[in-house]
Amino acid sequence: NRLAGGIVLRRQDPGLSGTGGLMDPHLLRKLNAARRDRQAAILITGLEDGRNRLVMRGDPVAGDLGAAIGKAFLSGKSGTVEADGQRFFLNVHLPSPRMVIIGAVHISQALAPMAAMTGFDVKVIDPRTAFATEERFEGVDLVADWPEDTLNDQPLDAFTALVAVTHDPKIDDWPLISALKAQAFYVGALGSRKTHARRVERLTQAGVSGQEIARIAAPIGLDIGAQSPSEIAVAILAQTVLALRRPVDTAASGQRVSDT
């Protein structure tokens, strides 16, 4: 049996939109499960026949429709496309991107509000209570605790950016490893090339593969000649957006902020 009625969206849930097609209850349950689990999905409706199908990110789809789906996953925009001689409505469902910043430092003070304005759900984590104060991070989701204690309850995922800026391996290394295992879309770490070389040694000893380590953007940020904490924050945010919208090997792109 098919669910009577079209795909109707309420105002309080802007992630759904109406196409007028009938939706199979099984697809609806699958879509709701994907949204609950923060997985990317596109509901495809054939505008000629009204048939629906759900495609998860990574599912193989051939032809022009597959290319259109790939672009829609990157842009996050729903809309009508013509592919393979037919017209389809692509209803895109992407989890809200998150940014977890490890370290309540000056760079973080600039980065957190800018990232929030860009659309990221931002969290700053630092066990050092002298740094992690509400006075320094007014209006920011701030956790004065060890990253492993916080992130075990709120795991990282593929729609999370991890930015490690404490310069302290006791604080940075665990979330970096967790972000790589979770396939976070962006993993960046502050530090010079010498600092990163020592980091690579530690992560290798911890069992992280060279391929995984190569995903770390270090030194962090696009190479815009940044000097001040605010400028470095701009470079980090730009590199994060690049990784979100153009998911290539950002860490191997050679686009860095500095060696500091």
Map each language-model feature to its residues.
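Compositionally biased, low-complexity intrinsically disordered regions
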Residues: 2-3
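Segments forming oxygen-rich coordination pockets for charged ligands
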Residues: 6-143, 157-160, 195, 241-260
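Short amphipathic alpha-helix with an adjacent loop that forms part of the alpha/beta core around
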Residues: 148-157
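N-terminal glycine-rich "phosphate-gripper" loop used for MgATP/nucleotide binding
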Residues: 166-169
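Rossmann-fold NAD(P) dinucleotide-binding segment
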Residues: 171-184
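Adenosine-phosphate binding glycine-rich loop
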Residues: 190-260
